[in-house]
């Protein structure tokens, strides 16, 4: 897991133990979720003041291409389809999409629109909220 920035910035490796890709945004002290497709696991960690990850723990026994967290704290993992977990790591649902997702993120004015990037299309799904799809 790497930190990157503008061309005049320097990047550094967050973790030597994670094999993951996809974009996440986080500030120091914030909890993040990263997915390892090769291990088929999703991890939770806290971003330190220097950008390193600490308190690394398995969040879900499913990895994937991308992870996104909604405004209610539910965690979405893209792995062939979208698997949805509550903040405690319990799977609460699935979202089927017409093609394999390669990246997901939340947007919209209330952060309740899940944007799903496939190989040939961009999809948008409205989510309801805490522990609901």
For the regions a protein language model found, what residue spans apply to each?
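Short loop/turn segments immediately following the C-termini of beta-strands
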Residues: 37, 47, 80, 109, ...
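Surface-exposed loop/turn elements that mediate protein-protein interactions on large endomembrane-trafficking
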Residues: 2-9, 94
